[in-house]
UniProtKB/Swiss-Prot annotation:
One of its GO terms (biological process) is glucose metabolic process. Its main location: cytoplasm. GO terms for molecular function: erythrose-4-phosphate dehydrogenase activity; NAD binding; NADP binding. It catalyses: D-erythrose 4-phosphate + NAD(+) + H2O = 4-phospho-D-erythronate + NADH + 2 H(+). NCBIfam families: E4PD_g-proteo, GAPDH-I, PRK13535.1. The record marks 181 as: Activates thiol group during catalysis. Catalyzes the NAD-dependent conversion of D-erythrose 4-phosphate to 4-phosphoerythronate. NAD(+) binds at residues 11-12, 317. This is D-erythrose-4-phosphate dehydrogenase. CDD domains: GAPDH_C_E4PDH, GAPDH_N_E4PDH. It is an enzyme of class 1 (oxidoreductase). It comes from Shewanella sp. (strain W3-18-1).
């Protein structure tokens, strides 16, 4: 049984916990502790009730500063200094680092010094970590000596499996990406101050361009794609589910049918459970709570002049990513034991 702690219990932290109990992986992973500065009553309430994902299927109680879920008792901590967390006493195997602010190796090593054996960051990180993993594409690169690992981003997990499939079958020469991302909690409900002037504006009233390092994230997973991609991102007034508009120039001549065929085969084969394919007339809310990293919308595939291909990809940027955190942590332990 893997003993884990969650540091930072926001959207991703809570999704990880709920996904654990829904995914069937509870027999492999035990959440021992949650470190979050919010009041315990709010932690319990937001675990039980969620606007995006609905009510949690298990009853959650607060008893003696523990979250009780069935027979599981999860210690709730409120320690702002990661170096002071009781990971050694709790025998923590992996910390899910989900604060969104501890992103480099030096900061994450506070968890290691506190006694945790490994750290998995729920965010793109600095380049000095042991590895950045997109589960299903490069998790086989994990090694026993890896202690600090990044799970990349939700959009990197969405797009990289698709690029990998296209490159292996047709060769990818270059690409351009537009991420159409749901609003996030770094935006404002009504106009308010922010360092990014666009993010001073009300999230529910505008399509808001934001910076993205998605193209660099692709390079980290697929180094041979260096300088082949550029990306932009906009936030839209929805609370969950992201779409990615992917345009790629291929080395081989293709048509819509051949592109969709290889992606559907990959979804049913090598990337089963990670990549999906649909030809139904669906909209973004239909992918809410979908555990897969990416779903190709085959109805929107377009081909121009035989080599320029446009695809539409969907992902639940919370739930899909939370499920990959579970998968990557299991792969980290497997690598450590091999």
């Amino acid at each position: 049984m893997i003993r884990v702690a969650i540091n930072g219990y926001g959207r991703i932290g809570r999704s990880i916990l709920r996904a654990l109990y829904e995914s069937g992986k509870r027999q492999q992973i035990q959440i021992v502790a949650i470190n979050e500065l919010a009041k315990p009553e709010a932690i319990i309430h937001l675990t039980q009730y969620d606007t995006t994902h609905g009510r949690f299927q298990h009853k959650v109680k607060l008893v003696d500063n523990h979250m009780l879920i069935g027979d599981d008792a999860i210690k709730i901590l409120h320690e702002p200094d990661a170096a002071k967390l009781p990971w050694r006493e709790m025998d923590i195997d992996i910390v899910y680092e989900a604060t969104g602010v501890i992103l480099d190796r030096q900061s994450c090593e506070a968890h290691i010094h506190a006694g945790a054996k490994q750290v998995l960051i729920s965010h793109p990180s600095s380049a000095d970590v042991d590895g950045t993993i997109v589960y299903g594409v490069n998790h086989d690169l994990l090694r026993a000596e890896h202690t600090v690992v990044s799970n990349a981003s939700c959009t990197t997990n969405c797009i990289v499996p698709v690029i990998d499939v296209l490159d292996k079958h047709f060769g990818v020469k270059s690409g351009a990406i537009t991420t159409i991302h749901s609003a996030m909690n770094d935006q404002q409900v009504i106009d308010a101050y922010h360092d990014d002037l666009r993010r001073t504006r009300a999230a529910g009233q505008s399509i808001i361009p934001v910076d993205t390092k998605l193209a660099r994230g692709i390079e980290r997973i697929l180094p041979h794609m260096k300088d082949k991609f550029e990306a932009i991102s906009v936030r839209v007034p929805t609370i969950n589910v992201t779409a990615i508009d992917l345009s790629v120039t291929l080395a081989k001549t293709v048509d819509i049918a051949s592109v969709n065929q290889v992606l559907e085969l990959a979804a049913n084969g090598r990337f089963n459970g990670i990549l999906g394919y649909t030809d139904e007339p669906l909209v973004s809310c239909d992918f809410n709570h979908d555990p897969r990293s990416s779903i190709v919308d085959g109805t929107q595939t377009r081909v121009s002049a035989g080599q320029l291909v446009k695809l539409l990809l969907w992902c639940d940027n919370e739930w899909g990513f939370a499920n990959r955190m579970l998968d990557t942590s299991l792969a980290m332990i497997a690598a450590k034991q091999s």
